[in-house]
Amino acid sequence: MISAMEQRVRHYWTLRSHDFGAVRKNELENEMGQKWLREIERLLPEKEHLRILDVGTGTGFFAVLLAQAGHQVEGIDLTPAMLEEARLLAAQRNLDIVFREMDAQALSYAEESFDVVLSRNLTWTLPEPEKAYREWFRVLKPGGWLLNFDADYAANVRSRMQNCKVAPDSPYGHIGMTDALQQENDEITLTMDIGQLRPAWDLRVLRRIGFSDCRSDATVGQRILGALDLTHAPMFGIWARKA
C-alpha cells in the first residue's frame, strides 16, 4: 500500500508522462544522450557488462542509454504510465530491458543484486529519501557504486516565492506544463523532507548508512545542460561506493 503522498506524486507524473516521454526521446536522439553516456561511463566500474538498476526510470532514458552500451539494465518506477512510455522506447530500439512497477523506498530485489544503482531527478520526489538510500545500499554488491543526479529543486521554488518579481527558472523538461501542474509541482516539492540544503544532506546520510568514497559534483548541470541548467537549483551529481 503506497502512502497518500506517493499517490499524489504518481498522479502528477501520470499527467506528465506523455510530454515527458517526448522530451526524453528527443534527448536520446541528440547530443544530450552522448553527453550523459560520457558522464556516466567515466564513473562506472571497469567492467564490460554491468548489472545496473535505474531507480525512478521514468520513461526509460537512462535504461535505454545504458542497455545500448551493452549493460544489463532493469528500470523501476512507481508510475505505470511512465513505464508504458519506457517499454515503448525500448521496443522501438529492439532492447531487452525489464521494467517493473516498484517503490524506490522498498525494493523487491535480493541483497547484493547490482553492480550499479543510478537515478536522475528522483530523490527530490521521495517522502522518505533516507529509506530509499538504505534500500539502494542493500541491493548493491560489495564494491558497487551509487550514482545519483538531482538538484535542490526546493531552492528554486523558495526563490520564486520569496521574490515574485524575479522570473523563475523553468526546467526545459517542463515545456508545456500548465499553471495547475506547476503549482502541484511546487507544493509537492516543499512538502518533502528532502527540501533542505543539498547535496550536503545526501552526503551526510550516505556516510551514516555505510557508503564510502562519497563525493558530489556541482558542475554536472553545466557540462550536460549548459544554459538549460537552473540558476537557483543547478543539477549536481553524487557518487558513493559500497565497500
Regions found by a protein language model. Give the residues of each.
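A short acidic, Gly/Pro-enriched loop at the edge of an enzyme's catalytic core
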Residues: Q105-V116
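A short SAM/SAH-binding and catalytic strip from SAM-dependent methyltransferases
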Residues: V116-P129
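A short glycine-rich, Lys/Arg-flanked "PGG" loop and its adjoining helix->strand segment in the class I
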Residues: E130-W145
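Short alpha-helix
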Residues: D193-G210, S216
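Core SAM-dependent methyltransferase catalytic element
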Residues: I209-S212, G226-A243
